[in-house]
């Protein structure tokens, strides 16, 4: 269990008795409160070119947690006890400075609109800096940005599913541009360790900066765990860069 040297912030979301939130610590790990931890891996479908998440075993956090159940996840990518922090950020001189923008997804999003031949509308919002490059937005030689502009209802249905699988929440969708809320999939409240990739945080858990201010609460976000993202604390796909070559081993 790492010695953080400072108190956790107040940003939190309450689900029953659990305070489900994540604190980004200064140049250190993520302090995770009230969230179960599991493993996920990407399973490609060679026939269709699509992919999906396959849930692996839950991760026991009891040996890493303090008396209150808080556990610490590695953020520098150097831990020898991944996904947990082992203090390597100190010896590695990890610079975990947060560079992500603080505006809301809607305020920052590029908006694309489409309508099927049957008159069913669809709106896709896209915030590129949040993209974790997981690849759910491309399949069968096409992509979300082209599919939304067509009028084929089956293509639109496939596109909606692709958007719903976006792990970073860079892509969202709605039926109308003036809809009060996006149409979000129902996701479990948890943190998922994605094989050789990001932490996928779902279900509306809040994430707070090391200065105590909260980022916008989202249904799904991807947090960097390789230490190389240029959009910290969020994943930008740097783990897949050959110069980073992040692995769980």
PLM regions: where:
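Short, structured motif recognition centered on aromatic/hydrophobic residues
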Residues: 30-32, 71-74, 83-85, 171, ...
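Iron-sulfur cluster-binding cysteine motifs and their immediate structural context
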Residues: 82-92, 132-150, 163-177, 232-243
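Short microdomains enriched in Cys/His and/or Lys/Arg
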Residues: 96-116, 152-168, 185-200, 246-249
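Ferredoxin-like iron-sulfur electron-transfer modules
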Residues: 26, 59-75, 111-133, 143-161, ...
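Ferredoxin-type iron-sulfur electron-transfer modules and their immediate structural context
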Residues: 21-34, 39, 98-135
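Hydrophobic, ordered structural segments
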Residues: 75, 81-82, 90-99
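Intrinsically disordered, low-complexity serine/proline/glycine/threonine-rich regulatory regions
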Residues: 35, 240-249
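Short helix-coil boundary/hinge micro-motifs
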Residues: 10-36, 40-42, 181-193, 202-204
């Amino acid at each position: 269990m790492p010695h953080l040297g400072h108190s956790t912030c107040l940003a939190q979301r309450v689900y029953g008795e659990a305070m489900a939130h994540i604190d980004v610590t200064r140049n250190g790990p993520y302090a995770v409160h009230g969230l179960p931890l599991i493993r996920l891996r990407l399973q490609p479908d060679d026939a269709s070119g699509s992919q999906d998440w396959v849930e692996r075993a839950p991760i026991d956090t009891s040996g890493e947690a303090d008396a209150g159940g808080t556990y610490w996840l590695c953020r520098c990518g150097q831990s020898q006890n991944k996904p947990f922090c082992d203090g390597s950020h100190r010896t590695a001189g990890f610079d975990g400075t947060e560079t992500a923008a603080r505006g809301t997804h809607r305020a920052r999003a590029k908006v694309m609109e489409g309508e099927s031949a049957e008159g069913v509308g669809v709106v896709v919002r896209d915030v590129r800096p949040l993209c974790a490059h997981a690849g759910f937005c491309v399949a069968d030689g096409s992509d979300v940005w082209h599919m939304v502009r067509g009028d084929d209802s089956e293509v639109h249905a496939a596109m909606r599913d692709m958007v719903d699988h976006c792990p970073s929440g860079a892509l969202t969708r709605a039926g109308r541009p003036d809809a009060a809320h996006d149409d979000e999939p129902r996701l479990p409240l948890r943190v998922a360790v994605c094989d050789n990739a990001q932490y996928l945080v779902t279900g509306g858990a809040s994430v707070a900066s090391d200065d105590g201010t909260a980022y916008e609460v989202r249904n799904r976000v991807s947090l960097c765990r390789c230490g190389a993202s240029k959009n910290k604390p969020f994943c930008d796909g740097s783990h897949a860069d050959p110069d980073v070559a992040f692995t769980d081993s």
